Amino acid sequence: MSFSRRPKVTKSDIVDQISLNIKNNNLKLEKKYIRLVIDAFFEELKSNLCSNNVIEFRSFGTFEVRKRKGRLNARNPQTGEYVKVLDHHVAYFRPGKDLKERVWGIKG
């Protein structure tokens, strides 16, 4: 797997792929409903992360919020000025075993 010039996949691409997958299984669901489900899914992810909940999808991975320590020697890349960064929270994703194996090319 090469990481130079990787193609970007958009939400519309994902909607198209899911729609095709559904059609291949002899089901019918309009793309606008697929988009609604995807939007609702991400809203729930954001809402749960903002509530400091851990979201686990077995074999795929875990989403959580972690606290990142501040530091004194951060540098603004535009001005070169040194600034103080306070402690803050960041969204974090920890991949699950199956995802790691697929990305690394390991047969499971």
From Swiss-Prot:
SMART domains: BHL. This is DNA-binding protein HU. GO terms for molecular function: DNA binding; structural constituent of chromatin. Keywords: DNA condensation, DNA-binding. It comes from Borreliella burgdorferi (strain ATCC 35210 / DSM 4680 / CIP 102532 / B31) (Borrelia burgdorferi). The keyword DNA-binding applies. Changing S19A: In strain: A44S and NY13-87. Pfam families: Bac_DNA_binding. Histone-like DNA-binding protein which is capable of wrapping DNA to stabilize it, and thus to prevent its denaturation under extreme environmental conditions. GO terms for cellular component: cytosol. InterPro entries: Hist_DNA-bd, Histone-like_DNA-bd_CS, IHF-like_DNA-bd_dom_sf. It comes from the Bacteria. Changing V9I: In strain: UK and VS116. Belongs to the bacterial histone-like protein family. GO terms for biological process: chromosome condensation. PROSITE patterns: HISTONE_LIKE.
